[in-house]
Amino acid sequence: MEVLTKDEVLYHRGSLLTADGVMVASWDLEQQESFSGDYFSLAGYRGIRNAAAAPFSVDYCNESVVHIINGMGVTLGDSIIGLTALEALREFNPNLHTIIYRPGRAPHYVDQLYHLAAGVVADLRWLPWKAEHIPEQELCIDAGNQLFWPAFTTLPMIDFFLQALGVEPTAIPATAKANRWMQKLCLPPLPERWQNKPYVLFCPTASTPLRSIPASAHVPLVNALWEKFACPVLGFGAVDHPHYVDIQPFSTTTADFLAWVKHARYVLTSDTAAVHIAAGYDVPTTAFFTSIAPELRVRDYPLCQPVYFAIPELNNVQASARKHDLEQVELAFTTLMLNELPWA
């Protein structure tokens, strides 16, 4: 095996292996101030499969267990779709046992989702993990560092994850691609004030400023929601509008966030995590996209109406906080015709 350079270690299309056979996530090394030692590609070791290294297919009807190394991302949105892909494997085999080996340093709010899904979609373990502790005869797939796989930016995300698991996406019905496994999760109740009361949800903040709704558009959009639905507009953070309520203090966990989305009458957002959650709970949504084509994220969501600002120089840019890029996004929102917003 060839030793990876330090750059290759961080941007490797998959997971890593130490000289003594321990599986490691690039993400975990990146979170450290520094790292040392030799690292190799995990792909192929002890029969571990990696679709970025060599495409493969699996007949899950004949598998009893699958081990997923370094799945399914370190953001909330990616993780929801990755878990949807894992749940979809039960279309072939309802009794399939799935075990995910998570990066040990993933953000806490993301891992909270996996804890909610534990025993529902998959069982959990954490990297680093000795490869030899996984029985060699059992199916083992490396899904790590997917952000650096070429197909990640060109395929609908659910199709990407299915291919990474060795499944032809067309073999899975669209109804199994809409995150409805989330309806099995045990969530906390809303505060008493909002139980059984109608509200709409405004979620303007995405994981990167590039995909967030500019502050200058918050009040106009909250007002559009109020005029459309005539019920309180709830959201996360301050907005100066008489019919808006900041519920940030009442949403301190990922489970809280899911519950607020689940019970909303409608969601208006640029946060794809909120879009994926709303789809899982069949909540109608209008979703703004600034750099990612909507069909790559919401193709299978019949209750989602996308608004796409096609900004050529930002096409497929995953993240940015550069002043010029954010000015382009803000300019795009000034062209928005609020009376022509698409509603699901």
Regions found by a protein language model. Give the residues of each.
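Catalytic machinery of carbohydrate-active enzymes
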Residues: 1-344
